């Protein structure tokens, strides 16, 4: 059963009416209601607040990494383990083909259902997950394979065990190594891009965000708690943090925004997956045609956070 957010209640009501019209076999009513539904969807989704966009980024029906991998990756083979400690199910790594292009795909997977969410640790990777991702990145470099990364995490796992095994070192090592990989790298934030947990697989030649995804140094709720000691300030925090794709594109922190289906990726995962596939293939062609892509990646990373100070 589809899950509707509070601001989608009118959409839910019209959808229910369409289903009743189908049961009655009333094609005329169905056609009228579908036009009304399209109009309502456009009205709602063209006027979303930043808080509503955050809700969409976390929508329970939103496609996760494994959904996209199942839809766009063919002849796939999953790889496990980090060769040091364990296999982290919050990070998934695959070798396969996207439109006959051999590729390595690395994704953060939140899981569905209680059992699978626990298995995936709710998409919060441990150090062994980031080391598994780095292992696969080095594999891709050795065999000259492009890398697609799918980012979707509330953040790296903050548990004691993770810290004991070097969580910060694992993330920092990925930032260093991914910056100098000698193969094309493309990263897409598909839902939540939470802090260092997202950055660890977001250093790339091309960094894109899905239209209703977020990218932030801390959750808005965490920001509100720290700065104002008041969870009700979450919406204020969202505006101040500038976590939406449009804000981050204007700031030069991401390269592209991938538009979602009219009702969001959670209503049409097939179209969303195809859009990601086409973006990857287009971005890959652009990178491969650039003989200086490594230097351009370096310069892009070095320019982040730069500013000019004037003395008056």
From Swiss-Prot:
Pfam families: ACCA
InterPro entries reported for this sequence: Acetyl_CoA_COase_a_su, ClpP/crotonase-like_dom_sf, COA_CT_C
Annotated CoA carboxyltransferase C-terminal domain residues: 36-286
Catalytic activity: N(6)-carboxybiotinyl-L-lysyl-[protein] + acetyl-CoA = N(6)-biotinyl-L-lysyl-[protein] + malonyl-CoA
Entries under PROSITE patterns matching the protein: COA_CT_CTER
Keyword annotations: ATP-binding, Cytoplasm, Fatty acid biosynthesis, Fatty acid metabolism, Lipid biosynthesis, Lipid metabolism, Nucleotide-binding, Transferase
Gene Ontology BP terms: fatty acid biosynthetic process; malonyl-CoA biosynthetic process
GO-annotated cellular components: acetyl-CoA carboxylase complex
EC number: 2.1.3.15
Compartments, as annotated in UniProt: Cytoplasm
Biological or metabolic pathway of the protein: Lipid metabolism; malonyl-CoA biosynthesis; malonyl-CoA from acetyl-CoA: step 1/1
Role played: Component of the acetyl coenzyme A carboxylase (ACC) complex. First, biotin carboxylase catalyzes the carboxylation of biotin on its carrier protein (BCCP) and then the CO(2) group is transferred by the carboxyltransferase to acetyl-CoA to form malonyl-CoA.
Family: Belongs to the AccA family.
Protein name: Acetyl-coenzyme A carboxylase carboxyl transferase subunit alpha
